[in-house]
């Protein structure tokens, strides 16, 4: 699935609830998921880490939706930025 399609899917499924929760509380959920991912990585629990990677991605897309950021455009701009490319 392409990133833009995934962002749209997240919007269709969760935008109403996410909007009601608000950006601040949604950001707190995102931080909690990042913490859970960090714990899974630190403990070497690959199976749990896989689940947490997905959680973090979904919450990131949720935040992007709430802020009306097209994540595909943001990623494309990042990749085109010469300062973000590793030195050769």
Task: Show which residues each predicted segment covers.
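Flexible "arm" and connector segments at domain edges
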Residues: 1-53, 57-88
